[in-house]
Amino acid sequence: MITTSYRPSEHTIKTAKQLSKELNMPYCGRNKQTVEHLLKSAERDLLVVGKERFELYTKQGAKFFFHPNTAMFRAKRFLQGEKEPMLRAAGLSEGDTFLDCTLGLGSDAIIASMAVGETGSVVGIEKNHLVSVLVRTGLHSWETGIEELQAAMRRIQVKNGDCFEHIKQLPDNSVDVVYFDPMFHEPVETSDGIAPLRDLAEDSVLHEGCINEAVRVARKSVVLKDHWKSPRFEQFGFNVMKRKTALFHYGVIQTSP
């Protein structure tokens, strides 16, 4: 169900009604009702449209909203010239194309967008329709106070759909880097930012066909970010970049000659 913030403007109400049509979800006027009351009457989750952000409340009690999350800290370090592990794993350069197959909150896509710059491109695929709407809206409207970061966020293209189906439609060698960051098999305690996503995560376990298609379309590399104990690195033939103090590693399949 979709509703508005407590004291909505006419624009907020119009936006909420438009979203209800786009998402095929019922619209309910707020009428000063509490989120808790509305959530009880909602068939599934509750999307609250506000002036500055959208909030999603789940039946399981989780609250999800877009925020640049750790990308803010990573962006500052990137601008200071520090080496970013993900960029090093991917081998990203200015002008490259980056396909993020598991967009989530978009933190990695944001850093990739900063690295590839205006001459490159970043596309993020998110299977959950509601999450894709929230993240797309956030990327295009959030004010960060950091010009380079904000511009990078605005450049990201968000697409809703299944990443395997999307990759299958792409020509050979059509992107530079294909990136996967599936929901961890084991929760990582320091990844609090993704905790609300667990209730919303689509069950799209990586499989061999998906990796094979990624290798086909990637000019430079296919990168997998996963828990350090994950069997998927070995299962799919990734060379692991081990980091002594990190709870997750990056695996790389080089596709360039």
Curated annotation (Swiss-Prot):
Gene Ontology terms, MF aspect: rRNA (guanine-N2-)-methyltransferase activity
InterPro entries in alphabetical order: 16SrRNA_methylTrfase_J, SAM-dependent_MTases_sf
Domain of life: Bacteria
CDD domains linked: AdoMet_MTases
The protein, known as: Uncharacterized protein YpiP
Gene name tied to this protein: ypiP
Matching Pfam families: SAM_MT
